[in-house]
Amino acid sequence: VSVVPAEVLPGSALAVDETAAVGAAELGPRARLWPSLCAVYRAQLSRARVARIPLLFVATFQSIGIMILMRGVVDGGGEARAVVAGSSVLVVAFVALNLLAQYFGQLRASGGLDHYATLPVPPAAVVLGAAGAYASFTVPGTIVTAVFGCVLFGLPMAHLWVLVAVIPLAGAALAGLGAALGLLAPRPELATLLGQLGMSAALLLGVLPADRMPEVVRFTRDLLPSTYGVEAIARTFGERPDWAFVLGDLAVCGVVGFVSLAVATWAYRRAAVR
């Protein structure tokens, strides 16, 4: 006669206790936002380390070339300030808006969002980490462009420290917009097109002086988040900058950045569950 241990019998008390213990096992703690964001940020920096030099070369020398071309057209004064400020912010738009839209568009089309969905990181960390990494790529190019423009047009460089605030705030606004465009576009080709159109709008409406634009075009210019970064830089080139207006422009960049990154996070959640 074979003997069966009591603990393996379905109706035994031991089996019930073990089943309850397994069912009551707790999940691990949820990943916190800040450590997850830093991890995604470092991963994005490492991923793009090889492509960073040619990326900065293209973004920077594109803006420098535009300033050289405009040197023979613009005499000085407010027009020169607009050209230098617009060319500096264009570096941010090229990377944070254009390239980030392409990146998220390709990531969605290739199924890369499924990989991020399996990681124990909040959706906001993925969007903010990628946006922060792409925005940080623009720091050297923006500084070089602004300094070169000041030398080329004879503008003062005493207040270029305002770039410390303009780059992250304008970068957040444009990166959030680029991420949202890439995640909401149904096809990667459309995401690339939208990113290119956004960068072109930042170029044309940021470099050209606003007082020469028609009223309709000027209204469109006011809708772009890059405009307020351009205005903040351009105001500091004056003899006596009105810092209240500068802070107002930076505040608009910050609000638009918060809203655009929130929309991008929602778009990431929407795309990841499909």
Short names for language-model regions:
Residues A158-H159:
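Interfacial aromatic-anchored transmembrane helix boundaries in multi-pass membrane proteins
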Residues V1-V144, G149-F153, A165-A173, L177, ...:
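Hydrophobic transmembrane alpha-helices and immediately adjacent juxtamembrane helices
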